Amino acid sequence: MSSVDLASYIRTIPDFPKPGILFRDINPMLRSPEAVAEVIRLLSLVCERTRPDLIVGIESRGFIVGAPLAHQCGLGFVPVRKPGKLPGDVVGIDYSLEYGSDRLEIQADALVGQPRVLVVDDLLATGGTAAATAQLVTQAGGELVGFAFVIELKGLGGRTVLPKDLSVDSLLAYD
């Protein structure tokens, strides 16, 4: 049982980034060494269960959580980024958003040898970015073993678009 109440470090900001959105801000949590340590401790339990070879973090807050998690678990870290941010050859995927489209990329040689991959991000909302990352990991040669998020917005149904046979873990859930 944890003595750190992670939910108390999440600030709710109405109408950001646009009217009608209730934004869950992790920045107060990031300012607390105790809260960050607890997040990494809890996510490391997901690593123990899923046994990945690498952590893949989604730009940009997935880097903030994913890199220290990889370090804690003795694993490598691979960033998934927006287009044009990674040097060298990349593998990319285009995906649809609620109002438009976007693209994610990973270095072409990042997942050589079919490593087992845990995808990490700060937030699961509609699941579009996580689902695209799952496809990208597979396309780049990785074996996806699961997803881990700090926060899940359950009312947006993100789990429903992720592969059903994989572990999906979140530390905090909001309706």
Swiss-Prot record:
The metabolic or biological pathway listed in the UniProt record of this protein is:
Purine metabolism; AMP biosynthesis via salvage pathway; AMP from adenine: step 1/1
Assembly behavior: Homodimer.
Q: Which GO terms describe its molecular function?
A: adenine binding; adenine phosphoribosyltransferase activity; AMP binding
Q: Which residue pairs form cystines in this protein?
A: none
- Give start-end of the signal peptide: none
Which PANTHER family does the UniProt entry name for this protein? ADENINE PHOSPHORIBOSYLTRANSFERASE (PTHR32315:SF3)
Q: Which PROSITE patterns match?
A: PUR_PYR_PR_TRANSFER
User: Would you say which domain of life the source belongs to?
Assistant: Bacteria
Q: Which family does it belong to?
A: Belongs to the purine/pyrimidine phosphoribosyltransferase family.
Tell me the keywords, alphabetical order.
Cytoplasm, Glycosyltransferase, Purine salvage, Transferase
List GO BP terms, alphabetically. adenine salvage; AMP salvage; purine ribonucleoside salvage
Q: Where in the cell is it found?
A: Cytoplasm
- Which reactions appear under catalytic activity for this entry? AMP + diphosphate = 5-phospho-alpha-D-ribose 1-diphosphate + adenine
Gene giving rise to this polypeptide: apt
Organism of derivation: Synechococcus sp. (strain CC9902)
Q: Which HAMAP family match?
A: Aden_phosphoribosyltr
Functional note? Catalyzes a salvage reaction resulting in the formation of AMP, that is energically less costly than de novo synthesis.
One GO cellular component term noted in the UniProt record for this chain: cytoplasm
- UniProt name for this protein: Adenine phosphoribosyltransferase
Q: Name the EC number(s).
A: 2.4.2.7
KW DNA-binding (keyword) present? no
